[in-house]
């Protein structure tokens, strides 16, 4: 099922499968989100929960049992309950039912996704509550994909990623399987812009740590049109696109937790996490994205 809201600038559609934003159009009717061509990448803007990246061996252990887990958790692959779709707000909820706890993740949780339109900005808040009787440890992140180019008159090299100040981000290195290898390097030094090319992501994504910038955006160089994500408070920000020539979309991904590492312990309670909630506690994070195009 899908729900749609709109204001004077934007029209947003969210699917209850994965609580995923699947369409965002401006007043000209132009589609701003990637439309999930399965020949390139079959998603639009998935929620990453309760882990980000891959699990070493594709498994984790909890409560004496081994659980299999795919990339970026499972919230993106299951049905969420629509709570509200009116005015400028869409709200959905996912809770750990018996099937989830038996097959995917043996901990109680309630994940609430709230989308709110505010002028040309979409605020997407993810709230996690622990309704159980034991600690809840989880990872979480965002993965929106934006159409590139903005129109037929432009090509890949007409675009660049920009920070709001010069940056020398620490790039966390990964093995070809996507798991972190414990090393890092500097890809760019004291740069405020990263030129977009068709080969930029030939070796997959860039996981950036240590950013001081409050924003990461994709800009059309000759017009100034842009899409900007507020990444303030996020320890990790990734940029990525699927292999395609020319580039069809770009992702700007603020994460509150690290991707999995090759030497991560199998015990879930020893894994790095975005947060560890005691019973009754609640935690939230918001991604605000502004569309000036």
PLM regions: where:
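Extended, loop-rich substrate-binding clefts of extracytoplasmic carbohydrate-active enzymes
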Residues: 70-119
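Short Pro-Gly-centered flexible turn/kink motifs
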Residues: 14, 60-68, 126, 275-292
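Acidic-aromatic substrate-binding/catalytic surfaces of carbohydrate-active enzymes
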Residues: 11-66
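Active-site pocket scaffolds in enzymes
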Residues: 226-293
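Beta-strand elements of well-folded, non-transmembrane domains
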Residues: 18, 96-98, 115-119, 130-132, ...
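Short, Gly/Pro- and small/polar-rich lid/capping loops
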Residues: 1-8
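Acidic, contiguous internal or C-terminal segments within carbohydrate-active enzymes
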Residues: 101-151
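Active-site/ligand-binding surface loops and adjacent short beta/alpha elements
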Residues: 148, 152-232
């Amino acid at each position: 099922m899908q729900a749609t809201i709109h204001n004077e600038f934007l029209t947003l559609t969210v699917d209850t499968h994965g609580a995923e934003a699947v369409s965002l159009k401006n007043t000209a009717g132009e589609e701003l989100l990637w439309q999930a061509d399965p020949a390139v990448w079959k998603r639009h803007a998935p929620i990453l929960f309760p882990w980000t990246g891959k699990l070493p061996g594709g498994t984790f252990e909890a409560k004496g049992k081994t659980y299999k887990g795919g990339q970026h958790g499972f919230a993106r692959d299951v049905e969420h309950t629509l709570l509200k779709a009116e005015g400028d707000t869409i709200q959905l909820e996912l809770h750990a039912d018996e099937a989830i706890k038996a097959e995917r993740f043996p901990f109680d949780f309630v994940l609430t996704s709230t989308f709110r339109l505010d002028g040309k900005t979409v605020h997407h808040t993810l709230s996690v509550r622990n309704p159980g009787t034991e600690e809840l440890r989880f990872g979480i992140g965002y993965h929106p994909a934006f159409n590139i180019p903005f129109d037929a008159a432009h090509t890949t090299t007409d675009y660049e990623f920009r920070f709001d100040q010069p940056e020398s981000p620490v790039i966390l290195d990964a093995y070809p399987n996507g798991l972190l290898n414990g090393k890092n390097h500097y890809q760019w030094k004291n740069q405020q812009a990263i030129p977009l090319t068709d080969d930029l992501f030939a070796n997959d994504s860039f996981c950036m740590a240590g950013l001081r910038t409050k924003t990461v955006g994709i800009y059309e160089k000759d017009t100034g049109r842009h899409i900007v994500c507020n990444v303030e408070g996020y320890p990790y920000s990734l940029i990525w696109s699927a292999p395609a020539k020319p580039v069809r979309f770009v992702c700007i991904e603020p994460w509150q937790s690290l991707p999995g590492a090759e030497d991560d312990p199998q015990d879930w309670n020893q894994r790095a996490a975005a947060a560890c909630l005691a019973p009754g506690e609640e935690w939230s994070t918001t991604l605000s994205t502004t569309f000036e195009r």
